Swiss-Prot record:
Assigned keywords, A-Z: Acetylcholine receptor inhibiting toxin, Disulfide bond, Ion channel impairing toxin, Neurotoxin, Postsynaptic neurotoxin, Secreted, Signal, Toxin
Principal subcellular localisation of the protein: secreted
Listed CDD domains: TFP_snake_toxin
Disulfide bond positions: C24-C45, C38-C62, C64-C75, C76-C81
Family: Belongs to the three-finger toxin family. Short-chain subfamily. Type I alpha-neurotoxin sub-subfamily.
GO MF: acetylcholine receptor inhibitor activity; ion channel regulator activity; toxin activity
Name this polypeptide is given: Alpha-elapitoxin-Ppr1
One cellular component (GO) term of this entry: extracellular region
Signal peptide bounds: 1-21
Tissue: Expressed by the venom gland.
Pfam families with a match to the protein in the record: Toxin_cobra-type (PF21947)
Function: Bird-specific neurotoxin (tested on chicken) that acts as a pseudo-irreversible antagonist at the nicotinic acetylcholine receptor (nAChR) of the skeletal neuromuscular junction. Has no significant effect on the electrically-induced twitches of the rat isolated phrenic nerve-diaphragm preparation.
Subcellular location: Secreted
Length: 83
């Protein structure tokens, strides 16, 4: 019985790839590159760009948020793909 339970746990870990976390860039505008480890369950990164009175602005992070009209949004699904 213990062997069966252990086998099921191992199969679950292998099939679900537990422990993998997405890494996304999170620097703002033209700042030096920085990264963050996303929360469990996040599987995408984003890059938002827009212009305001300060010029062109860029925001990066985990997930794929909804944006207002006039903001360019790029979402991707590999580590550090939003640089």
């Amino acid at each position: 019985m213990k062997t069966l339970l252990l086998t099921l746990v191992v199969v679950t870990i292998v099939c679900l790839d537990l422990g993998y976390t997405m890494t996304c860039c999170n620097q703002q505008s033209s700042q030096p590159k920085t990264t963050t480890t996303c929360a469990g369950g996040e599987s995408s990164c984003y890059k938002k760009t827009w212009s305001d009175h300060r010029g062109s602005r860029t925001e990066r992070g985990c997930g794929c948020p909804h944006v207002k009209p006039g903001i360019k949004l790029t979402c991707c699904e590999t580590d550090e793909c939003n640089n």
